[in-house]
Every structure is written in structure tokens, then in C-alpha cells.
Regions:
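Extended beta-strand/beta-hairpin segments
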Residues: 1-58, 65-145
Length: 145
């Protein structure tokens, strides 16, 4: 029986939304603390400052890569390499997160493009982070490289 694993991150925020700032800490992995600001969300990204949307993109690209690589391996065509990006679109008005564009390029010896495309789409649908983001349109561009 699979066990439930809990991962924890925490955020400290000071001030109001527009002029305030904060930091998010990756508690479980203890990999670090990242600065946050409204400007990083609603305007041009500030160097050294992240946003919830960038963190969602990181989670989604990592989860998708793991899911897709597992599905390829189960197909007896494990990837030798894979690069995935997730571009999260955010409308600072009432739209919120309006879409996520996944792009993956992989080296997969012995696979036909049709099978690669089918498994890429199945991985998008079955990735746990994709499921958590089901209310957002997620597009996929997959290519053998």
C-alpha cells in the first residue's frame, strides 16, 4: 500500500500586497529560502525574486518529467535525457493563472514519434501536479530531440 508523503513549504510576508515582500522556505528539503514580491508576479521579474507562478512552473515541469520518463520506461523506451519547461501565464486582474504551456524535448532511442506523442499526452493527463491544476488550461508541445 502506498504511503502518503507530506512536503512542506512556508511563507513569511510583511506589509500589504503591492509594497510588501516576503520569502518562501522549502521546509522539507531544506534547499533554501526564496524572496517573493508582487512586482515579480505582476510586472517584469526581478532578479533574485520569485513568484508563486514560477514555483508552480517548477513543480509542474519536475512532476511532468518524472511521470513521462516513467511512462517511457514502462514502454521499454526509457529516455536518455529530457528537458521540460512550464510557462505559467498570470493575469494580475481577475484572471489569475490563465494557462500553463508545457514544452518537452527528449532523447528516446527506439520510439516512433506517434508513440512518443501519445505517451507525452498521457503523462500530461496523469501527472499529479497536472491533476492538481485541472482548473487551468494546460497545453503541451513535445518533440524528440
Amino acid at each position: 500500500m502506498p504511503r502518503t508523503v507530506v512536503s512542506t513549504a512556508s511563507t513569511a510576508w510583511n506589509g500589504d500586497l503591492i509594497s510588501g515582500s516576503g520569502s518562501t522556505t522549502l521546509e522539507t528539503s531544506q534547499l533554501g529560502t526564496m524572496d517573493l514580491s508582487w512586482k515579480a508576479r505582476s510586472e517584469d521579474a526581478e532578479q533574485g525574486t520569485t513568484s508563486p507562478e514560477e514555483l508552480i512552473g517548477a513543480a509542474h515541469s519536475a512532476c511532468y518529467s518524472m511521470q513521462f520518463s516513467n511512462m517511457l520506461a514502462e514502454n521499454d523506451t526509457p529516455p536518455t535525457s529530457m528537458n521540460t519547461s512550464a510557462k505559467v501565464s498570470f493575469n494580475a486582474g481577475e484572471g489569475g493563472i490563465t494557462g500553463i504551456a508545457l514544452t518537452v524535448t527528449a532523447q528516446v532511442p527506439g520510439i516512433e514519434d506517434a508513440d512518443f506523442q501519445r505517451l507525452a499526452e498521457e503523462a500530461k493527463q496523469s501527472c499529479p501536479v497536472s491533476k492538481a491544476l485541472a482548473g487551468v488550461e494546460i497545453t503541451l508541445e513535445a518533440s524528440l530531440g
